[in-house]
């Protein structure tokens, strides 16, 4: 008998069905409801059915908070799936402007491709700065002895001040940065030429050249050089990486506008003499 018991125990140990992972096969089949397999399938489907019902209820009764959040989203955060032709054209032109301006900034740094001529380009750009022109006009006005010369210089000074104030105001409104990250210099802060749009040097160069061509008697070579100077001043700002191409183009247009405004409100000789007397604290011409 003990030998038979040891044999039966050995058989039970070697039986595969006695392992823990196969214990469910030894359980009897439960009757009713289409069998145990049907119940297990039914119980397996119940969570998914509940989730579907919950989703349907949430779809029928949307939460007002989510709707409020969606309504409160700004238009900047929304994706424009169907942008207008005007928007596509503007974005394309801006991308071309930025790309070409970056490539033309060959004198932006000393290590650039044209870094050897950077000092000459900076000197050319300095000739269109507002501070030298304003102080130079004041010095010439103090040394002028003729009424006609003083009349021209006073109107030129007013044109320069108008250009500086208008360009600085537009730059602070737009606040566009240049194609290359460069901090403005000391003279730029004095002339309030901090941002990129519009190009102050280009506007001033066009206005001054147009003014001098209209009110000074110059030879043909000098007139040609004056026009080339205005164009090269605008190009130099692009080569230095300070402005985009559109900044310079708008600066040229703004310079023509300033010249037209000065011609419309041209101050007479008597008015200029009055302003000179007020500025020099010489009140005798007023009486």
UniProtKB/Swiss-Prot annotation:
Keywords: Endoplasmic reticulum, Membrane, Nucleus, Transmembrane, Transmembrane helix
GO molecular function ontology, one term from the record: sphingosine-1-phosphate phosphatase activity
Region (Disordered), start-end ranges: 1-75
Compartments where located: Nucleus envelope; Endoplasmic reticulum membrane; Membrane
A Gene Ontology cellular-component term: membrane
Main location: nucleus
Top-rank taxon, per record: Eukaryota
Topological region Cytoplasmic: 1-120, 168-215, 269-287
Low complexity composition-biased segments: 49-65
Spans traversing the lipid bilayer: 121-141, 147-167, 216-236, 248-268
UniProt family annotation: Belongs to the PA-phosphatase related phosphoesterase family.
PANTHER family: INACTIVE PHOSPHOLIPID PHOSPHATASE 7 (PTHR14969:SF17), SPHINGOSINE-1-PHOSPHATE PHOSPHOHYDROLASE (PTHR14969)
Function: Plays a role as negative regulator of myoblast differentiation, in part through effects on MTOR signaling. Has no detectable enzymatic activity.
Entry protein name: Inactive phospholipid phosphatase 7
Organism expressing this protein natively: Danio rerio (Zebrafish)
